[in-house]
Amino acid sequence: WKGGDYTEEPATGLRGAYTSMMWMTSSPYNMQKRSPTREQSERGYDFGSENFIKHQDANDMIYAFDASRFYNPEPKLSTIKCTFYAVNSADDECNPPELGILDRDIKLIPKGRYILIPWSEKTSGHGTHSNPTVWGDYLKELMEASEPGH
């Protein structure tokens, strides 16, 4: 990595980062469904990691992750005045619901609502945040509740 002053992407480090991200943002069920055999799993991993390495800059990745290192919204949650939905899925490994953080903190937001989407074949761990077919109805509900005069 050379302190970020590299001339070639540090493939070994990026491959390790890909592995961690893959495990943290997916779900075992979906991974098994996509690649039910060891051979399919290895092919999928090789393809995914090589694609990741080709399109990811190590410095950008470090910057993005470091930017959230000390992020803590809790002290200002009570200042949120609008209708607010916090949506999570039961299989989220990055924000595991069993820690109870959203259960506790949503109470600080006057118009806050915590929605925990149960595990299903449609959820995919933390990656569920990119699947509006799972949470789109809640977005529609929030938009309607946010209309003037509602």
Please give the residue ranges for each predicted region.
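Short beta-strand/loop motif that positions the catalytic acidic residue
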Residues: I80, A86-N88
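Acidic beta-to-alpha connecting loop that harbors the catalytic carboxylate
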Residues: A90-D92, W119-S120
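Conserved alpha/beta-hydrolase "acid-adjacent" motif
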Residues: N72, E93-I101
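Alpha/beta-hydrolase-fold enzymes
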Residues: W1-N51
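Active-site nucleophile elbow and catalytic-triad environment of alpha/beta-hydrolase enzymes
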Residues: D60-K76
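Catalytic active-site module of serine/aspartate enzymes centered on a nucleophile-bearing elbow/loop
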Residues: I109-H150
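Short, conserved loop/helix-junction motifs that constitute active-site signature segments
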Residues: L77-K81, I106-P110
